[in-house]
């Protein structure tokens, strides 16, 4: 699920072509009705819902908190906090056989982020939601979060002012990532698989950093 239909349709087609099974559901996570429809689509097509990954997030607004507009603040809250809460509520109502929820937080939740304080505060709130949902939904539903480090996604590159991939090597050196490279989406995907699998059956309420040691 994502806002851009063409992108999710391509991902679903790739999964189906490789022998998996997927459906594409264009979804704006800031719309609670769309989240309800998404959760129900999973049940209708697959027969049940057992896993939710809250992966939508970000903020293109940058600047000191004292200069942030009320709209930019609210947009960040709607996308990064309210959507996580609303999607979890929509999924939990349908997780009749138990399940696992993974929230994608961020390393910025750990401390002050001048110029992006609203986003850091939102991700800190995601961690708090993760811990509380984990307590409230145990033992049938496990809830954990992943805190990614620097991964050159479209949103991160825009936030750091990198125009294209040619600027990444210099930025990686500047950031001094211990593992020596930026992360990849697959690094986060592997952590999600762990947190949704029986291998993490006694893990809940945890924030897992996947940061290359940063």
Residue positions per predicted region:
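The beta1-alpha1 cofactor-binding region of Rossmann-like NAD(H)/NADP(H)-dependent oxidoreductases
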Residues: 5, 26-38, 70, 186-187
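Substrate-binding pocket helix/loop in short-chain dehydrogenase/reductase
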Residues: 63-65, 72-74, 173
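Active-site helix of classical SDR
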Residues: 88, 122, 130
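Alpha-helical segment proximal to the catalytic Tyr-Lys
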Residues: 93, 134-139, 201
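Residue(s) in the substrate-gating loop at a strand-loop-helix junction
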Residues: 106
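Short, flexible catalytic-loop segment of classical short-chain dehydrogenase/reductase
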Residues: 110, 147-158
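C-terminal helical subdomain
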Residues: 145, 168-203, 210-212
